[in-house]
């Protein structure tokens, strides 16, 4: 019986394919809001499907779509906040937007500092740094959204007043807290009550109202962002 050759073969060095480094893309205001509206159009299209299913007597499927689009609408809000934050912070660096207090406290890695020094003609290092920092962040709570708007120089109070002009301050605050609470219930609890595990009620009317509130919030933020340009 012949012996098996168990010796390790030599490995050629530097033969692995190197992954291409993808730098963050900087979008302007128009592109960012266009991304949001594109996603929102899809959400509204799904709501039309929910209506059709409900009219045909398939309420369970209709309700399921309503719940999924509530979560989707907030994901669009979250992504919008990420993209508009990167845009505004880069504009502060460029000198076309007033710098917020929080801008001065941004954390920058030594690697990015070296990149900035050796590539003076490029400002991509800052966008890459911000993208890296925000990649795991979520702004879907009243506290985190308020804090993030402060970072980019937007007043949370002004945003709510512009989004819901016919409501009182207390009513505006409740709208936002309820929006985030319902999204969390759907995304993390299957939309069931913590007390007795009963399924929360949902219908097309509520989902459309919810989606409209998200659209109002984004429109308000965006108008304040554009208004804040200094050059």
Regions found by a protein language model. Give the residues of each.
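Amphipathic, Lys/Arg-enriched alpha-helical patches that create a basic surface
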Residues: 39, 148-185, 200-231
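Helix-loop junctions and short alpha-helical segments
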Residues: 72-73, 79-167, 172
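Secondary-structure capping and boundary motifs in well-ordered enzyme cores
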Residues: 65-69, 73, 178, 206
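Intrinsic-disorder-associated interaction segments
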Residues: 25, 29, 36, 70, ...
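Charged/polar positions within long, soluble alpha-helices
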Residues: 48, 52, 78-89, 181-195, ...
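Short helix/strand-bridging catalytic loops that position acidic/His residues to coordinate divalent metals
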Residues: 57-61, 196-205
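Charged alpha-helical initiation segments
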Residues: 2-71, 83, 101
């Amino acid at each position: 019986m012949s012996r098996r050759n168990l010796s390790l073969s030599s490995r050629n060095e530097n033969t692995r394919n190197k992954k291409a480094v993808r730098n963050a893309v900087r979008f302007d205001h128009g592109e960012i809001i266009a991304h949001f509206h594109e996603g929102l159009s899809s959400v509204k299209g799904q709501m039309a499907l929910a209506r059709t299913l409900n009219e045909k007597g398939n309420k369970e499927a209709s309700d399921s779509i309503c719940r999924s689009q509530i979560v989707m609408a907030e994901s669009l809000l979250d992504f919008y906040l990420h993209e508009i934050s990167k845009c505004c912070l880069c504009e502060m660096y460029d000198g076309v937007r007033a710098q917020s207090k929080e801008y001065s406290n941004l954390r920058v890695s030594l690697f990015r500092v070296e990149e900035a020094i050796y590539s003076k003609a490029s400002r991509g290092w800052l966008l890459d740094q911000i993208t890296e920092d925000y990649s795991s962040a979520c702004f879907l709570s009243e506290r985190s959204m308020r804090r993030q708007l402060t970072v980019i120089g937007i007043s949370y109070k002004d945003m709510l007043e512009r989004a819901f002009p016919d409501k009182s301050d207390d009513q505006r605050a409740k709208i936002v807290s309820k929006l985030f609470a319902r999204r969390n219930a759907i995304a993390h609890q299957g939309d069931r009550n913590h007390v007795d595990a009963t399924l929360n009620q949902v219908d097309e009317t509520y989902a459309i109202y919810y989606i409209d509130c998200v659209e109002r919030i984004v429109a308000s933020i965006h108008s304040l962002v554009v208004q804040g340009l200094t050059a």
